């Protein structure tokens, strides 16, 4: 993927506020502090397109970004992080319906990158997100982040455990490191496959 330009479009909560359905979309979902912002910044080759926060759960809106590139252009959609205990209950209650409306109704959505920390076994919230994607027939792209923080043996062991928890084959999981940028091209290839295969 050769990127010409990446720009922030807008933030939204309700479908009426989403940008027009002009380009295919790939959304990014994951628990708070799983490395979602860092992943997006690395794949679009921008240091601070998506701000990383030391306060988990701070992102409470759906953020839309447009990527103009070759061989295709698309929107990247940053969904709110989930699963952080200190977020106020009323905010948590807004997140579920907000994300479910987007996942179920967005016509241009071609796939969702579900981001997991390779050091952690997927939580109930992770499984709920994956089940949402499956029920809405959205293509999941599973990316395991922070791979530079584990040894080769730990990586193999954790990959097997995560795959078993998700009831997926290990070959379906993408390893990624924001530090070394390993996995960037693989993530883009998975995104391109989703955009091309699920095009109307």
From Swiss-Prot:
CDD domains: YihA_EngB. GO terms for biological process: division septum assembly. Its cofactor is Mg(2+). GTP binds at residues 30-37, 57-61, 78-81, 145-148, 176-178. GO terms for cellular component: cytosol. PROSITE patterns: G_ENGB. Gene3D superfamilies: P-loop containing nucleotide triphosphate hydrolases. Mg(2+) binds at residues 37, 59. Residues 22-197 form the EngB-type G domain. One of its GO terms (molecular function) is GTP binding. Keywords: Cell cycle, Cell division, GTP-binding, Magnesium, Metal-binding, Nucleotide-binding, Septation. Disulfide bonds: none annotated. Belongs to the TRAFAC class TrmE-Era-EngA-EngB-Septin-like GTPase superfamily. EngB GTPase family. PANTHER family: ENGB-TYPE G DOMAIN-CONTAINING PROTEIN, MSS1/TRME-RELATED GTP-BINDING PROTEIN. Necessary for normal cell division and for the maintenance of normal septation. This is Probable GTP-binding protein EngB. It comes from Trichlorobacter lovleyi (strain ATCC BAA-1151 / DSM 17278 / SZ). The gene is engB.
